[in-house]
């Protein structure tokens, strides 16, 4: 993410999964933008790990994106707002998705935990179409965000092209 000094708005310009790196265009909180990988347009709906990353960005988050008098604004934390906007740029409707997917449990970010975690009802098959089939038909999903070092240290697998792979030095 990067801060735009002239607008005082946080904007996500790049995201990275285990195997891919994407650039995101657009300015401010306007949910219009394009995802590019090595200069070529990418549809998040056709990239399992990008889609799941964007769902995590939106659903492990308390910010609200809204438009007032033609101007897009965020209610809540600017960093969480930037994550909400990048999910919207990826084709996820924030209001509809947060209304559909129920948050069952929340462990808020604290300076001790250095992460936020939510347990969600994952019954919406269209949204969660990229869940690995090896997980079975689970109605629950846990999303977390926080310190990359802490999260990587607690992770054993990564999604690569829709498949779970052991998280090792190569990834």
Q: Which residues does each predicted region cover?
A:
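Conserved cytosolic headpiece of P-type ATPases
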Residues: 1-171
